[in-house]
Amino acid sequence: MTTPSAATSQDLPRPAPTSPGRFAWIDWYRGLACILMFQTHAYDAWTREPYRQGAYWDMARMQLGGFPARMFLMLAGVSLMLRYAGDARRGLTEWQARRGAMLRGLEVLGYGLAFRLGEWLLSGASRKDIPELFKVDILNCIGLSLVISALFFGLAHVRTSRPPILAAITTLAVVFLTPVIQRWPWPSWLPAPLAAYLWDGTPLGTFPQLPFVAYTLSGGFVASLWLQAVARGRLAQILAWTTTIGLLLAVAVQWGNSRGYALFFPTPTVTIPAYPSSYGYRIGMCLLFAGVSYAWTSFRGGGGFSPLRTLGQASLLVYIVHVEMVYGRLTWSLHHRLHPVLVTVLIVVLTGLMVGLAWVRVEIIGKRRFQWPLRRSDRSS
């Protein structure tokens, strides 16, 4: 069974009625992540040799392909803080809010497990592919990272100006200690399907918590600053700062890499360690993309149809459908057989189909008389 190794998403709760459209740019940002996800998976699935190397491949698959998963993980942290903001407006207690956040994380984890089961069944339910049922893909990672992040963030971080210092310290610990931990074998007493959630020590661990939970914690931390800025009417100014910091961080890391400044180096057992520089570059670019999303939606205004915003509002659905279209039996004859130019044309077609599907989900199924139970968190906000 062939499955993607890049990104997916979860749907973020909408802002409460008291702040219509204030965070609508996040939908656009999530839609941008969807576009990058489509091209990453399509180039990976359909590009033939000898084009799976060189500058084109490095840019399309390795560079741009590294962003969607991190963007969705960061957005998971943002969604957690938006959820807490809604909980605070409804007068929930700290325990009720954190419990609800953890249950949401477990719900997303359940989506991930159900998705693996569905993929296995659609691929023929082969016995040799049973281990694929336990592969830790991005939905699994997002779900568990939400559960963990709920331990570090709470209502106090949206009701007061107190920054989530413990979350920041934990993020740095994850970033700098993961390369060391990666050198360890996973615990022999722990079954491989469970060990795969820890770090990249098993074939099943595509998206282990170490280091990927750092992106969700980072999203929660940054979102707490954005929410405090909203309360003071200074969201644009704070976003300008976080965008600038992100850009400077990404540039500084790339400059350091070009000079050979590295804290950790590959080993025979860990060929691609989770460099702190990799985190710095990726999170810096994620912050830059957030600023661009805010600037673009502010410039265009909130009215009218937006393909990216529509994709962002139905990101979970388009993830599930596009994975089957790209990697499934429907396009099996195209796998690793197409020229990049033809793949690019098909990506445009795929994107159009996904925008249409998202529009149906949002504008027809999403209407109150056709409520779809994919986004219960929206109705509770």
Identify the function of each model-found stretch.
Residues 2-381:
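Alpha-helical transmembrane segments and their immediate juxtamembrane cytosolic regions
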